């Protein structure tokens, strides 16, 4: 697609679909969790997800936008122009999603990536432990294979965003 045409299409779509309340520029980390739970933020996320723009460069087969680097840059520029906050954020998009895309099985990609893109799956990270803090070399939690599943024993603490998450990726 011609980048100028894509820019115009993107600009028009953002003007029509990004709520004014989501055009606030940057959001402080501590405020982001609550903001992204509001009805308007969920509406913004759902509209963007339907277009694949919660994960613009991820493959379309999993709900991503399939954008190349130039289109992705244009989208980012147009969002910045209107001070739109990202339609979705979190550990799913930032950490575990890219890991699953790169290293996961086809089954794992099909199971998890569309739910990350849509916002149905909210992830948190389980790293810190009592007595170890975030010293990853001191982790005590263990995962033991039992048949076809892992049994995890241990404790995790200080899990940012856990109150909003329905999935956790944990270091063991």
Positions of predicted regions on the chain:
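Short secondary-structure junction/hinge motifs that connect adjacent elements
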Residues: 21-47
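A structural signal for short hydrophobic beta-strand segments in well-ordered beta-sheet cores
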Residues: 141-144
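Hydrophobic, small-residue-rich alpha-helical packing segments that form membrane-like cores
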Residues: 132-135, 150
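A short, Trp-centered hydrophobic/proline-enriched beta-strand micro-motif
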Residues: 119-127
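Intrinsic disorder at enzyme termini
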Residues: 1-5
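Internal helix-loop-helix
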Residues: 42-119, 160-167
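Conserved short loop/turn motifs at secondary-structure junctions
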Residues: 27-36, 60-64, 96-102, 128-131
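A short core secondary-structure module
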Residues: 148-149, 153-172
């Amino acid at each position: 697609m011609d980048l100028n045409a894509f820019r115009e299409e993107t600009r028009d779509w953002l003007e029509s679909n990004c709520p004014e309340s989501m055009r606030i520029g940057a959001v402080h980390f501590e405020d982001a969790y609550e903001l992204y739970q509001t009805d308007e933020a969920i509406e913004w996320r759902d509209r963007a997800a339907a277009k694949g723009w919660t994960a613009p460069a991820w493959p379309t087969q999993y709900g991503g936008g399939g954008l190349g680097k130039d289109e992705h840059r244009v989208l980012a520029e147009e969002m910045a122009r209107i001070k739109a906050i990202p339609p979705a954020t979190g550990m799913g998009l930032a950490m575990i999603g890219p890991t699953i895309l790169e290293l996961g099985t086809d089954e794992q990609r099909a199971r998890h990536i569309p739910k990350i893109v849509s916002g149905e799956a909210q992830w948190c990270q389980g790293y810190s432990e009592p007595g170890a803090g975030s010293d990853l070399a001191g982790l005590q939690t263990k995962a033991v294979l039992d048949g076809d599943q892992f049994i995890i024993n241990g404790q995790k603490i200080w899990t940012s965003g856990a109150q909003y998450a329905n999935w956790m990726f944990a270091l063991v």
